[in-house]
C-alpha cells in the first residue's frame, strides 16, 4: 500500500452502511496506488469481498463514511439457502431444482442465470463459508415463494451474521480501514476506474485514493423517496404517501458515482416495498417508519371498509393498497388482541416501560371505548367502520371470509373484534430494498450503456439489485445471501485479474483462524462463466 496519513481504526461495533455522492474525475498522471483494491462500504457485501480478497493475499482498503461497520444488514433478518446441513438436521427435504422452480414462479421474471447459480451454490458459497467463520444458524422458517422452509436465521438476527465476518476481516493484516470518510467521486484514467475521491467528514478535507480496482458496496437508494417514486414500476399506481424504511445511508450515491463514470442501470424500477409501516414516533417529520403488525387485526381504508386479504401476500396487498386514495389503512383490533401487536427491531422487542411506545402513544394509536368514538378519533366514517366490523365478525361466526378469502371453512379464523377498548393504528407503504441497480456481467464488473465492461469497477450487493434474483416480487432472505455471494464472486474475479496481470500464480491465500482447514477455492471464473453463458 502506498504511503498516506489516514487514521485506520479496527474495532467491532454495529452501524449503518456507507453513503456516497456522485461524480467522476479524469486522471492522467501515473500515481502509486494506495491499495490494490478499494472497497467502498463496510456492510455485508463489502466485508465479504474484503475477506475473500484478503484470503488471496490482496492488499485491500475498506472505506466507510461511518466510524463503524455493519450496513443495512443490521436492519435485516435472515438468509435464504438451499439444501443446507441445518435443513437436513431438521428433516427439511430440499433440492436446487425445487428451489429454482419455486423462485422463478414467485419472482415472475427473476434473472434465471443467477437464480440457477444461487440455488446450486448457496450451501457452499454462503452457508459453509460463513459457518466456517463462526456464524451459527439456529432456525429455518417458511416464507412466501418457497414450498419448503429455506429462510435461515442466526441467534440475534443478522447482527450475528455480520460480526463473525467483520472479526475475520479485522484479523487479516492486508485489510485496512478508513472510517469517517465519504466517497464522493470515482477517478478515471483512459476510461478505467482507478480510485475514488473521499472527504474526511471530521476535518472536511478531501483526498484522492488510487487502486487497481474499486468495489462499490454502497447499498440502495430507498431512503430517497423521490427517487423511488421517479423509478416506480409502471403498472402500479404510485402511492400518495410512502414512508422511509431503509437505512439512513441508502441514498443512492453509489448509483450516482457509477452512472457518472458511465455505468448503466438495470431493473431500476424494482423495489421491495413493505406494506406494514407505522410512523416512527421518534421522528418529528413523520417521514420514517417502523414496521409493525398484528395478525389478529382487521384492516380498513379511509372509507372505513376492508379492501384486501389481511393474511395475503405482500405483493397482492401492495397492489390493493396503492390503489386506495389515500394510500393508507388502519389496523383495527380490540383489547384481547393488544398483545398480538408487535414492532420489528431489537430496540422494540422488549419494552420494560409499562406504557407501550406505540399503543399508548395518542399520536400513533387511537383508542376508544366504542367503535363510533374510535372512528371519530381516527377520522373514519363511523357507520362504515361499525358495519365493516359487524360483517367481519359475522363471517368469523360463519367460518368463512366470503369478501376477501382470509379464512375458509376448516381454517382457524381470527378472533372477533368485540372487547373494548378498541384500537386503530394507521399504516402506510414503506420503502425497504432495491431489486435493481448497476448493470453487471458474470464477474460482477459494472457495464456501460452499450453493455461493455467498465474497467476497474465492480458493483456488489444491493447496489446491483441483489443479482436480479428477486425479479418483480422479492423473496425473503434474498438480499443478504446475494450480498455475500456477489461480494465473494467480485473478489474472485479481481484475484484472477490481478494474477493474470502479474503473469504468475495468485499470492498464497491467508488462513482464517476460524476455519477448520486450509481454505480451498470453491469455483473458478471459468466455471462461473460457463454456467452463466
Go through the PLM ranges and name each one.
Residues 31-45, 61:
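Beta1/beta-strand and adjacent pyrophosphate-binding region of the FAD-binding site
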Residues 58-59, 65-176, 180-185, 226, ...:
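Conserved N-terminal/central alpha/beta ligand/cofactor-binding core
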Residues 185, 384-468:
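A glycine-rich dinucleotide-binding beta-alpha-beta segment and adjacent secondary-structure elements
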Residues 187-208, 214:
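Conserved beta-strand-loop-beta-strand element in the redox core of flavoprotein oxidoreductases
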Residues 205, 209-278, 477-484, 489, ...:
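Glycine-rich loop(s) and the adjacent beta-strand/alpha-helix scaffold that form part
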Residues 255-257, 261-380:
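An anion/pyrophosphate-binding glycine-rich loop and adjacent beta-alpha core
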Residues 326-422, 490-493, 497-532:
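Helix-rich C-terminal "cap"/substrate-channel and partner-interaction subdomain
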Amino acid at each position: 500500500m502506498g504511503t498516506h496519513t489516514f487514521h485506520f481504526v479496527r474495532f467491532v461495533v454495529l452501524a449503518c452502511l456507507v453513503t456516497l455522492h456522485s461524480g467522476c474525475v479524469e486522471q492522467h498522471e501515473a500515481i502509486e496506488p494506495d491499495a490494490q483494491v478499494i472497497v467502498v462500504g463496510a456492510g455485508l457485501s463489502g466485508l465479504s469481498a474484503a475477506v475473500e480478497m484478503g484470503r488471496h493475499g490482496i492488499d485491500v482498503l475498506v472505506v466507510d463514511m461511518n466510524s463503524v461497520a455493519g450496513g443495512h444488514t443490521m436492519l435485516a433478518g435472515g438468509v435464504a439457502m438451499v439444501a443446507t446441513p441445518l435443513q437436513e438436521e431438521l428433516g427439511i427435504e430440499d433440492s436446487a431444482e425445487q428451489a429454482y422452480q419455486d423462485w422463478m414462479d414467485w419472482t415472475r421474471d427473476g434473472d434465471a442465470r443467477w437464480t440457477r447459480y444461487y440455488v446450486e451454490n448457496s450451501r457452499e458459497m454462503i452457508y459453509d463459508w460463513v459457518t466456517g467463520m463462526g456464524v451459527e444458524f439456529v432456525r429455518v422458517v417458511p416464507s412466501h415463494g418457497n414450498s419448503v422452509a429455506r429462510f435461515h436465521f442466526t441467534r440475534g438476527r443478522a447482527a450475528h451474521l455480520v460480526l463473525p465476518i467483520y472479526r475475520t476481516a479485522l484479523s487479516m493484516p492486508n485489510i485496512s480501514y478508513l472510517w469517517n470518510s465519504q466517497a464522493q467521486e470515482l477517478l478515471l484514467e483512459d476510461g478505467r476506474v482507478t480510485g475514488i475521491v473521499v472527504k474526511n467528514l471530521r476535518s472536511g478535507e478531501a483526498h484522492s485514493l488510487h487502486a487497481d480496482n474499486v468495489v462499490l458496496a454502497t447499498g440502495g437508494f430507498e431512503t430517497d423517496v423521490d427517487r423511488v417514486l421517479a423509478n416506480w414500476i409502471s403498472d402500479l399506481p404510485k402511492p400518495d404517501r410512502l414512508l422511509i424504511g431503509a437505512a439512513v445511508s441508502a441514498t443512492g450515491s453509489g448509483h450516482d458515482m457509477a452512472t457518472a463514470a458511465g455505468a448503466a442501470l438495470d431493473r431500476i424500477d424494482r423495489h421491495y416495498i413493505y406494506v406494514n409501516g407505522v410512523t416512527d414516533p421518534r421522528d418529528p417529520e413523520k417521514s420514517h417508519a417502523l414496521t409493525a403488525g398484528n395478525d389478529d387485526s382487521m384492516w380498513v381504508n379511509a372509507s372505513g371498509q376492508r379492501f384486501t386479504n389481511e393474511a395475503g401476500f405482500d405483493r397482492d396487498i401492495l397492489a390493493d393498497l396503492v390503489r386506495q386514495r389515500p394510500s393508507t389503512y388502519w389496523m383495527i383490533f380490540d383489547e384481547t388482541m393488544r398483545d398480538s401487536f408487535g414492532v420489528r427491531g431489537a430496540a422494540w422487542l422488549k419494552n420494560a416501560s409499562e406504557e407501550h411506545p406505540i399503543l399508548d402513544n395518542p399520536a400513533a394509536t387511537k383508542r376508544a371505548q366504542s367503535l363510533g368514538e374510535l372512528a371519530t378519533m381516527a377520522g373514519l366514517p363511523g357507520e362504515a367502520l361499525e358495519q365493516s366490523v359487524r360483517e367481519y365478525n359475522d363471517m368469523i361466526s360463519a367460518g368463512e371470509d366470503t369478501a376477501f378469502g382470509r379464512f375458509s371453512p376448516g381454517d382457524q379464523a381470527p378472533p372477533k373484534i368485540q372487547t373494548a377498548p378498541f384500537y386503530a393504528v394507521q399504516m402506510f407503504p414503506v420503502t425497504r430494498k432495491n431489486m435493481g441497480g448497476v448493470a453487471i456481467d458474470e464477474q460482477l464488473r459494472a457495464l456501460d450503456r452499450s453493455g461493455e465492461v467498465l474497467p476497474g469497477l465492480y458493483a456488489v450487493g444491493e447496489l446491483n439489485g441483489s443479482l436480479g434474483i428477486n425479479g418483480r416480487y422479492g423473496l425473503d432472505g434474498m438480499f443478504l445471501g446475494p450480498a455475500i455471494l456477489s461480494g465473494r464472486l467480485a473478489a474472485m474475479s479481481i484475484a484472477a485479474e490481478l494474477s493474470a496481470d502479474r503473469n504468475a500464480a495468485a499470492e498464497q491465500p491467508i488462513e482464517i483462524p476460524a476455519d477448520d482447514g486450509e481454505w480451498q477455492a470453491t469455483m473458478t471464473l471459468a466455471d462461473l462463466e460457463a454456467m452463466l453463458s
